[in-house]
Amino acid sequence: MAATRYPPNDLRRQVGSPRSKGRENKDTLCRNILIYGNCRYEDQGCTFNHDQNKNPSPQADFSKKTFNVDSPAFTPSSQPQVLAKKTTLSSQAANAAPFTPRGAGTPNLQQTAEASVFNPAAIREFTPQNYDIGNTNSNGVPQENGIYSDPFTTMGSLGSTLPSAGQYNLYASDHNSLGGPGAQFYPQHGSFPAGPLQPPNYHLYQPHDSYRQELQPWQRATYDFFIPAKMREELQKKMFATQQVMPNSGLPQLERWHSLFPLDTNNRKNTSSFGYPSWVYKAQNSRTARHYALRRLEGYRLTNEKAILTVMKEWKKIKNGNVVTVHEAFTTREFGDSSLIFAYDYHPLSKTLQEHHLQPTHGNRYRAPSAVPENVLWGYICQITNALKTIHSNKLAARCLEPSKIILSDNNRIRLSACSILDVVQFESNTKSVAELQQEDLVKFGKLILALATGAPPAHLNNIQVALDSLVTKYSANLKDAVAWLIAPSNPGESKSIENFISGIATHMTAFFDLALQDGDEKQFHLARELENGRIARSMMKLMTIIERAEPGGAQSWSETGERYQLKLFRDYVFHRVEADGKPNLAVGHMLSCLSKLDAGIDEMVVLTSRDNETVFVLSYRELKQMFDRAFNELVKHSKTGAPGANN
């Protein structure tokens, strides 16, 4: 028995290299290469091929396949002599080709030297090329339906059953039959069949959770579904201020402007800024229906019409976030005199820097306003610098940098609100060049910041050096140096520019820029969350048009039968829930969640019960959405055909 399982060494040597058969074996790879990695008879007359990278002869592909040398042979234990004889490989067995399943296409007998070692790098990714579903013989081999048939060669039979291309409907519930028979998302230009289709990603629900601010636990329930109360309150106040009117105000109606409302908080005439008394009104344009801020110069007589045309042409090019955009200028006599009107963008609930920082407070004692924080001052400096950079780049000058002509809105946002007025008023009398006016802008800029820092109006700054020295006690030396550079006159032969000033405050500009980006992220977060509210509103309006409605054809029980009755029960499930003790359940989250699931048409199941508990339905939101769409589409169809009762 031992001799049967373990033959003598002289018998095992016969397995080394098959017996030579002549030159017909020169293309056959030696079996020792595959088993041991080398052949010791290569230099001793072995006629088989020892080059691993050489492709075998095509003629060997169709040789006899009656024996596979890799498969184990049946060896009876009772015949040891036969076993010793079969251990020697014949040349016919050496020439046998590997086993290849039927229907796999043209076989490839190329093998590597490390066939027994797994090499991931040698595996190439499958990429279909020149694939035609209508070609049933794409691989050039007869099609067989045996157990080893290639699934890719049998796809041709599906070509006749696939529908043709049609229109893709984004809002369809069944995405396997979109837009009717044969609808598919991609046109029929490609070579792949149209399988089950899905809506694009932007049509699905995805919560926006990239921003989250610290809130108290009792605030989170409402905050999770709506914008913050403070932001909503500010927006509502601005909307109310925009629509505010004053009945019997006595203000005239201009040619294209109506509903004038005064915005001045002081009724005293002040001629220090423009040389004429100026007033500000809110008005609505009858052509655009938008609201504008009208600044009126009382008693001005226009002597040169080119002044308005030339100045407005240049200032309309200024588009900057820290400059109030001017739209037009015109003259009128509706106020009982010759007045010059400038139309600017209207920013509701805005205050001037004069009113916010330099207005003394009245109490038990008359006291000066409190000091402005340094970070707020740097924010003002960065914003005014941004405005002057745009104005000076267009070869213009602001000329009106006064606390009473710079408005302040929410989040310390400031804007220059009286630009272009002095250019029109002093169009003929001005003798200074644009470069000189720009140098004056820098000096006025420095005095403005100094006035805000010291709490004294610019007209009361008699001793500039004393005011600069007083900054050291409340602010940093960097702020003092920046203000001193703006106020100081330029050296002979040199001229200061806003670009030089920007390079000096680059650190503070980047800090302010970062704060602006954070504020933009917060607003974008709230906007993205409110984006889905339109879907919920549409679902509610559609649902209310279906429920408790008589049939357009005349039947009064249309909404109480069929699918409409289940929608009515869904209405009760969403809005008319009660607690175990009979108290109304007013959970806003439940209402929003159910309506969102209905609009999305998810597979979640919901139990709908009638009010008498006699009828119970177990449905999915997908089925409810299909019922919902069919019922509403029926109403739409009757509304287009003009059926009686369609407008009930």
From Swiss-Prot:
Q: Which GO terms describe its biological process?
A: mRNA processing; nuclear-transcribed mRNA poly(A) tail shortening
Say yes or no: keyword Coiled coil present. yes
- ZnF bounds (C3H1-type): 24-53
The keyword Zinc is assigned to this record: yes
The subcellular localization recorded is: Cytoplasm
State a GO cellular component annotated for this protein.
PAN complex
Stretches the record annotates as Knob domain: 546-648
Coiled-coil region(s) at which residues?
Answer: 507-545
Task: Identify the keywords attached in UniProt to this record, alphabetized.
Answer: ATP-binding, Coiled coil, Cytoplasm, Metal-binding, mRNA processing, Nucleotide-binding, Zinc, Zinc-finger
- Cite the residue spans of the region called Pseudokinase domain: 244-506
Q: Region Disordered: which residues?
A: 1-24
User: Origin, by domain of life?
Assistant: Eukaryota
Molecular-function annotations in GO: ATP binding; poly(A) binding; protein kinase activity; zinc ion binding
Question: Which residues bind ATP per the record?
Answer: 295, 345-352, 404-405
Read off the SUPFAM superfamilies from this record.
Answer: Protein kinase-like (PK-like) (SSF56112)
Q: Describe the family membership recorded for this protein in Swiss-Prot or TrEMBL.
A: Belongs to the protein kinase superfamily. PAN3 family.
Quaternary context: Homodimer. Forms a heterotrimer with a catalytic subunit PAN2 to form the poly(A)-nuclease (PAN) deadenylation complex. Interacts (via PAM-2 motif) with poly(A)-binding protein PAB1 (via PABC domain), conferring substrate specificity of the enzyme complex.
Q: What does this protein do?
A: Regulatory subunit of the poly(A)-nuclease (PAN) deadenylation complex, one of two cytoplasmic mRNA deadenylases involved in mRNA turnover. PAN specifically shortens poly(A) tails of RNA and the activity is stimulated by poly(A)-binding protein PAB1. PAN deadenylation is followed by rapid degradation of the shortened mRNA tails by the CCR4-NOT complex. Deadenylated mRNAs are then degraded by two alternative mechanisms, namely exosome-mediated 3'-5' exonucleolytic degradation, or deadenylation-dependent mRNA decaping and subsequent 5'-3' exonucleolytic degradation by XRN1.
Q: Give the domain section of the comments.
A: The N-terminal zinc finger binds to poly(A) RNA.
- In its UniProt entry, what is this protein called? PAN2-PAN3 deadenylation complex subunit PAN3
